[in-house]
Regions:
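Electropositive polyanion-binding surfaces
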Residues: 42, 194, 199-201, 217, ...
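A general secondary-structure junction signal
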Residues: 72, 80, 433-435, 488-490, ...
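Acidic, low-complexity intrinsically disordered tails
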Residues: 1-17, 673-682, 717-743
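A short macromolecule-binding patch
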Residues: 107-112, 173-179, 659-676
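Charge-lined substrate channels and their catalytic hotspots, especially those that engage the 3′ end
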Residues: 1-297, 304-350, 382, 681-684, ...
Length: 743
């Protein structure tokens, strides 16, 4: 651009200044656009000759100041340094591209692999917006790595003659990581290791790592389970000082302690748990008060009697947040001395509890309720199967008590659903393992009345404790809130609900509800309709994904899924830290103590919610690993399944018998060239016109089982399709969709 000298430029008037502001705002609103002089003059209200002259002068000043540059003849754009800049966290995909999560921005910023500047997953980066799409979303270029993530990577070492490369398990690390063989001479080929990124110099093909830990040879069950824990930065042992602190706890129950508690040792009390349970943190007692009136005690292990606030053990429990349940093991929140011994409500032993006691009639009216510390004696340990047998036959130990509890529990359950609770009955996958941890079979744990019996009384205790702690009556009779730890669940967003509505429409189901309890009512109706159908699992899974996530907070919004205005977690303090927090709050408020520090509670709630999510991800990873390990023995075999998902590159199929899911790449399907018709959400064969969509029954062959990536590849067999091809002479009707890159 030919510059004008400053002395020949006219003075800036108010009108000129306004036009300059409009022009600058245009550049900033559309940072990737190239604007002509004519366009800018017209857009700023200066289509006349005089207006174009003023626009040219403004562009001259912006050019001199380094804000815009001439990129073609009389075409202008923002200079790189004046493009919108953001700082955020890099979220890497399997392809090597990155999405940058920026606080306060609705959408992530997409960064193509060629513009990532060696950034890695979890890095804090500076990104400049170089393009803005029609949907308003930015595409960016990473200009600086503000801070490298210290998150470790787990992978398999490939040892060469002069170097070691670690192939990471995580799909978020698509590059191999270099280790110095000279620095780490003992690392073996095929060994599972934990590494951190130390450096990634510009121009280098691979990041340089530092060895954190050697886990053992890949494929060994203990190694692989420890690898999952390491991937999610979860501990698998306690430090010696914590074990020593646990061993030092005095477990004796003195006469003085018993005298300070309500004594339930003469009241029939028992536990009901899974057959493989080692810690028993809840028990039920039942006593007939008079005809049609029962006293039900919900007795919870008094963990906070043994674990003092801010002690070594308490600090570790805060750090862990929750117990973690992998397929073949439990990683406890508390040391075994507490979780399996002192706090566990074992049969034929006296135990200390924190209890919620209710006097109920057959109409479920709560005639009395009492909260406080107790001492109990567990008369019997039932498994769920044993309690279920009593329910079904009417015979067995404590049959009258169990039948009474079950009758009341089923009535509570009916009342809950009548009030708008959602019936999410999901199957829980289990594995039959040999002594080495190898999966021999897959089965599903069914929720029966014995499970529901325990669940309903735990829900009753949780909601009543939440309301008692969260509110109090003033001297003038007003109800006021006080700081409390809640387990809350919001109603689904309109956007997620609309996606769910469109999803189930493909199966012929219509969902009209848009807000309030009508959503829950219609969901329950839908679940009843799809029971036993091919689409049941796909629809139920999508329904769960459409819901908001439950979390811990001090700001009560109620629990939408359970239809409770007040709800908390009180009943599992051995395995959840928020329950320990609630026990301490209950003790405080029973003693008329002053209100707790809400800000401190909120910080602990936030951390507990984070730890819960991480634990759930690790649990799912262990299930996926065992599913792939199980199917590795069935390579080449054929199975029946149903289509559970579609993408432009493949078909997800869930096997009917085991509910194991894998993907069949479209390119792997022999006999035709298949394309994804996004508009109609189906796959169509170009030659045959065969169509495949969600819920279709298919036959597959197991092609590959990648244990390291926990990934299954299937091959859909065309002769196993149960959807007919078009009649002869009827050509395939292929709707060509705009194929998008996998972002």
């Amino acid at each position: 651009m030919k510059k004008q000298s400053q002395k020949n430029r006219p003075a800036r008037g108010a009108k000129n200044t306004d036009r300059a502001a409009v022009i600058l705002s245009l550049f900033r609103e559309f940072p990737n656009n190239k604007f002509s002089l004519k366009h800018l003059a017209s857009a700023s209200g200066g289509a006349t000759k005089e207006g174009r002259r003023e626009t040219f002068e403004i562009l001259g000043r912006l050019h001199d100041e380094g804000i815009v540059e001439e990129c073609a003849r009389e075409k202008y754009r923002l200079t790189h340094k004046h493009l919108p800049h953001f700082e955020g966290i890099a979220d890497m995909t399997a392809s090597g591209s990155i999405y940058v999560r920026v606080e306060g921005e609705e959408n992530d910023i997409f960064v193509n692999q060629r513009n990532t500047a060696n950034a890695l997953n979890g890095d804090r980066v500076e990104v400049v917006a170089i393009h803005r799409g029609r949907d308003g979303k930015f595409e960016g270029e990473i200009t600086r790595i503000v801070e490298r993530s210290r998150k470790p990577y787990v992978g398999v070492a490939e040892v060469g003659a002069h170097q070691i490369f670690v192939r990471a398990d995580s799909r978020r690390m698509p590059m191999d990581i270099y280790l110095s063989k000279k620095q780490y001479p003992d690392v073996k080929d095929g060994e599972k290791v934990v590494v951190r990124i130390a450096d990634w110099a510009e121009g280098s093909k691979s990041p340089v790592g530092e060895l954190v830990e050697r886990l053992g040879m890949a494929g060994n069950n203990d190694t692989e389970m420890h690898a999952i824990l390491a991937e999610y930065e979860l501990p698998y042992r306690f430090d010696p000082e914590i074990e020593q602190a646990a061993e030092a706890i005095d477990g004796s129950i003195t006469a003085k302690e018993i005298a300070a508690r309500r004594d339930f040792r003469q009241v029939t009390t028992f536990t009901v748990d899974p057959a493989d349970a080692k810690d028993f943190d809840d028990a039920l007692s039942v006593r007939r008060v008079r005809d049609g009136v029962w006293e039900i005690g919900v007795h919870i292990a008094d963990v906070t009697h043994y674990v003092r606030p801010q002690s070594t053990i308490d600090d570790e429990a805060v750090e862990r947040g929750t117990s973690v349940y992998l397929v073949d093991r439990t990683v406890p929140m508390l040391p075994e001395r507490l979780s399996n011994e002192l706090c566990s409500l074992r049969p034929h032993e006296t135990s200390l509890c924190f209890s919620a006691v209710f006097t109920l009639n057959e109409n479920l009216d709560i005639l009395e309720e009492w909260f406080g510390r107790t001492v109990i004696y567990s008369d019997r340990r039932f498994t769920y199967a044993e309690a279920q047998e009593v329910i079904e036959t009417g015979r067995g130990d404590y049959a009258e008590e169990i039948l009474t509890l079950n009758r009341l529990a089923q009535a509570l359950r009916r009342q809950r659903f009548k009030n708008g609770a959602i019936s999410f009955d999901r199957e829980e996958v289990k594995f039959k393992l040999d002594e080495t941890g190898k999966p021999l079979g897959v089965y599903f744990k069914e929720q029966k009345e014995s499970n529901q019996m325990i669940e309903e009384f735990m829900l009753l205790a949780n909601r009543r404790v939440a309301e008692f702690c969260g509110t109090r009556k003033t001297d003038k009779g007003r109800t006021v809130e006080r700081p409390m730890v809640y387990r809350v669940h919001d109603s689904p967003s309109e956007e997620k609900l609309d996606r769910f509505r469109q999803f189930i429409l493909r199966f012929g189901h219509i969902f009209k509800a848009t807000k309030g309890r009508a959503i829950a009512k219609e969901l329950n109706k839908l679940f009843a309709q799809i029971k036993g159908t091919t689409e049941e699992n796909a629809v139920a899974t999508m329904a769960v994904r459409s819901m908001a996530k439950a979390y811990y907070t001090t700001d009560n919004i109620g629990h939408y899924g359970l239809a409770f205005p007040y709800y908390t977690h009180f009943t599992s303090p051995i395995r959840r830290y928020p329950d320990m927090m609630v026990h301490r709050l209950l003790a405080r408020y029973l003693a008329d103590g002053k209100a707790a520090d809400k800000a401190m509670l909120e910080d602990l709630c936030f951390r507990a919610s984070e730890r819960e999510v991480i634990a759930a991800e690790a649990e799912r990873a262990s299930i996926k690993y065992k599913m792939v390990e199980f199917m590795k023995e069935h390579i080449g075999e054929e199975f029946e399944g149903h289509i559970s998902g579609l993408t432009e590159w493949g078909i997800y199929v869930e096997l009917d018998e085991t509910h194991i899911e894998g993907m069949s790449f479209l390119r792997d399907i022999d006999g035709d060239f298949f394309q994804f018709d996004e508009a109609n959400y189906q796959i169509i064969g170009r030659s045959t016109g065969r169509r495949m969509t969600l819920g279709d029954a298919v036959r597959i062959r197991v092609k590959r089982a990648d244990l390291q990536k926990r990934q299954l590849d299937f091959e859909v067999l065309l002769d196993g399709l149960r959807t007919p091809a078009p009649a002869e002479g009827q050509g395939p009707q292929v709707r060509r969709s705009n194929r998008r890159k996998n972002r």
